[in-house]
């Protein structure tokens, strides 16, 4: 089973929201198990449908651990293809977080 782990510089509440947004954008059946906060769904990435699990934990304040597992890869999806799916999801989650925090730091001046 392929998996990817990534450390994110934010509290888990933000990482979980970004993970949910990202998975829902490429999945029709995303579900969250709230006890351990595990998100599962069948995602369609590059035309291939694979089942994944996403978990977010917070080992320290303002730091989250993102863990994405390939539960059931698309038929005939190579190991490299599976890695690309995991990277696509992790990069998308990280991009959503960057956009969120960049907008929060944005100043506007009128006049």
Placement of each model-derived feature along the sequence:
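Ser/Thr-rich, low-complexity intrinsically disordered terminal regions
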Residues: 1-111
